[in-house]
Curated annotation (Swiss-Prot):
Gene3D superfamilies cross-referenced by the UniProt entry: 3.30.1370.30, 3.30.1490.10
Pfam families according to UniProt: Ribosomal_S8
Protein name, entry field: Small ribosomal subunit protein uS8
Presence of keyword Transcription regulation: no
Xref: InterPro entries: Ribosomal_uS8, Ribosomal_uS8_CS, Ribosomal_uS8_sf
Alphabetical GO biological process terms: translation
Membrane-crossing segments per the record: none
Molecular function per GO: rRNA binding; structural constituent of ribosome
Gene: rpsH
Length: 132
């Protein structure tokens, strides 16, 4: 089966595993998915991410994070720019998610960045997703 939007597939897998409170999930790896997962880890939305070599494209194993009373850390995940409708923003238009409580993930000329990093570097790009 041909997958038209692998990033949306990854975000949906994270959202679904989070809803049923799974400890971990696996997604087919790619460079952009790996960078998105590293941002989620750095921003504290997931516990850990590891790359598993399987002599094909590899697998990303993502360990989800929950609060002390088993409450979800990720309350929302939304794909913004899709293959059929790309969404680009200029440096001064970089969006804020929930007034700074969430993050926007952007693909820029300087790599995959959060909205805060893009504002600091003064760069715009394609808005991949919102996470809150």
């Amino acid at each position: 089966m041909v997958m038209t939007d692998p990033i949306a597939d990854m975000l949906t897998r994270i959202r679904n595993a989070n809803m049923v409170r799974h400890e971990k999930l696996e997604v087919p790896a790619s460079k952009i998915k790996r960078e998105i997962a590293e941002i989620l880890k750095r921003e504290g939305f997931i516990r850990d991410v590891e790359y598993i070599e399987d002599n094909k494209q590899g697998i990303l194993r993502i360990f989800l994070k929950y609060g002390p009373n088993n409450e979800r850390v990720i309350t929302g995940l939304k794909r913004i720019s899709k293959p059929g409708l790309r969404v680009y923003v200029k440096a001064h238009e970089v969006p804020r998610v929930l007034n700074g409580l969430g993050i926007a993930i952007l693909s820029t000329s300087q790599g995959i960045l959060t909205d805060k990093e893009a504002r600091q570097k003064g760069t715009g790009g394609e808005v991949i997703a919102y996470v809150w």
